[in-house]
A protein has these predicted regions:
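A short, charge-rich alpha-helical start-of-domain segment used by transcription regulators
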Residues: 6-30, 34, 43, 54
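Sigma70-family region 2
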Residues: 9-10, 50-67, 86-88
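Amphipathic, non-transmembrane alpha-helical scaffold segments
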Residues: 21-25, 73, 113
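Conserved catalytic core of Hanks-type protein kinase domains
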Residues: 23, 35, 52, 74-75, ...
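Structural recognition of an alpha-helix C-terminal capping motif at a helix-to-coil junction
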Residues: 30, 44-51, 66-78
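Arg/Lys-rich amphipathic alpha helix in sigma70-family domain 2
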Residues: 74-95
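Internal acidic/polar
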Residues: 90-113
């Protein structure tokens, strides 16, 4: 949280960020866990969401506003989906590499002249 606060400019925005963090962190974590089914990855998603919040504090409404809550849930969903996609791409690459034959063929690469 301290590192994220360094991304926020004014003292007023810092106070608002702390309130957002304290009030919505667990809700955001629940949203991310529901998508990712992995607590550690969900924490990463919430962290990424708060990075976006810190970068765009001027666009974030007051903590008690329903629109602010919806905004935080939306960016958390997007962060979790991004992590889900990255994880699936990585897993599919690992599967592909595992399926390759273990030959000792020599591969020669010829650079274009």
């Amino acid at each position: 949280r301290v590192i994220l606060l360094m991304m926020v400019d004014t003292p007023e925005e810092k106070r608002k960020f702390v309130i957002l963090y304290e009030n919505y962190r667990y809700l955001m974590l629940k949203v991310a866990v529901d998508i990712l089914r992995d607590y550690q990855l969900a924490e990463d998603a919430v962290q990424e969401a708060f990075v976006q919040v810190a970068k765009h504090m001027e666009n974030v409404g007051q903590p008690e506003e329903t629109a602010t809550k919806r905004y935080l849930i939306t960016i958390t969903k997007h962060a979790a989906i991004d992590i889900y996609r990255r994880r699936n791409r990585l897993q599919s690459r690992e599967i592909y590499m595992d399926e390759l034959p273990e030959g000792k063929e020599q591969v020669t690469y010829m650079a274009p002249e």
